[in-house]
Amino acid sequence: MPTWTEYIFYKKLGKAPSPGDVVEVVPDLVGFHDLTGYHVLEVLEQMGKVEVFDRGRVVVAFDHLAPPPTQRAAELQVYIRRHVKALGLPHFYDVGGGILHQIILEKYAMPEQVIFAADSHTNTAGAVGAFAQGLGATDIAAALKLGKTWLVVPTPFAVRVVGEFPKGVMGKDVALHLLGAFGAEGFNGYSVEVTVEKPKAFPMDDRATVANMSTEMGADALVFIPDEVTVAYLHEARGVSYKPPALGGGKYADEYTVELGRLEPLVAAPHSVDNVKAVAEVEGIEVDQVFIGSCTNGRLSDIEVAAKILRHGRVKARCIAIPASYDVFRRAMELGYVDVLTKAGCVVTYGTCGPCLGGHFGVAGPGEVVLTTSNRNFKGRVGHPDSKVYLANPAVAAATALTGRITDPRQYL
């Protein structure tokens, strides 16, 4: 029997390719955002007539510099809007719609699909069992115009998740654990296939976080093999029925087991995603700003745990909270989470990447320390190159905002 990745490629190609093969694939979905869209469309213009192979398979979102903080950003968005209108693209999400990867996960991604987008965190859609990969602007332009593009078939690697999350531990800690175990390039050339022993103990939001940060692990893709949680998510979110195929017995290059019960809240310290430490090792470090959000940890359960902790008082560090999409924001408002966050002193806004890339809405200054739920912490990522960035789960982030120092959240849960 094939592995999940092999199964997807077999369906696409009509034959079973081997790892390392260069193949042409017809994507089920292609996406770009405001920061990469200009380059994608520029390449399309250079190829001749600006056209797409299938308007219904294209998703565009303004998320990185939205609302535009500079005149140049506004100019780029005007340019992209003009092309979106001319092409008649129906799946366009303007300012406030949310982050591209969250929108794809919420509304479009399906198991067994191949998804390409002009952003490195396209892997997020692997949470539902799609083979999702970020590509450069030239390759995305080719996929849009020709309806196909090339890739190198990755080597399957198995990760088995057993047990249940202890208090204060989330999907982010699984991602950081893997980074600590394998390093920032440990899965280069691999498609990581994750099976979950107790599916209901590992919700979709946490799966999305792990899939998202597989980029930092160097993985070509990370896919959660569909199970009952996948089926329930697709039905509840979109009213879509899905029955996973019966696979098993595939051959993997290697395998690794994550025991959830042995994990604790983790932190990636400056200036590398694989500089992973237990929260106790960095507890007490003063923090100037906390960011809760991004395509990594801006989903509803992330906002929920932050609100649960921030009910305990007002923040002592600047706190910015950004739900990853309009739908998440709206639901967080309905459930009272936004009210809790604002009363605690957090600044809350619609879905935007904002401070994650040091673009706007919370850029770090010289010498400042930032703790964020996003996915990267190299020098200058959140702003000034002399700032320091720590990565952690939303519970650690909320507890840190509450005390003004890096804090173990378990005392508040």
Curated annotation (Swiss-Prot):
Entry note: cofactor: Binds 1 [4Fe-4S] cluster per subunit.
InterPro entries the record matches: Acnase/IPM_dHydase_lsu_aba_1/3, Acoase/IPM_deHydtase_lsu_aba, Aconitase_4Fe-4S_BS, Aconitase_4Fe-4S_dom, HAcnase/IPMdehydase_lsu_prok, Homoacnase/IPMdehydase_lsu, IPM_dehydratase_rel_enz
PROSITE patterns: ACONITASE_1, ACONITASE_2
Binding site for [4Fe-4S] cluster: 295, 353, 356
Associated pathway: Amino-acid biosynthesis; L-leucine biosynthesis; L-leucine from 3-methyl-2-oxobutanoate: step 2/4
Membrane-crossing segments per the record: none
EC number: 4.2.1.33
Catalytic activity: (2R,3S)-3-isopropylmalate = (2S)-2-isopropylmalate
Record-stated family: Belongs to the aconitase/IPM isomerase family. LeuC type 2 subfamily.
HAMAP family from the UniProt entry: LeuC_type2 (MF_01027)
The protein's name in its UniProt record: 3-isopropylmalate dehydratase large subunit
Protein species of origin: Pyrobaculum calidifontis (strain DSM 21063 / JCM 11548 / VA1)
Phylogenetic lineage: Archaea, Thermoproteota, Thermoprotei, Thermoproteales, Thermoproteaceae
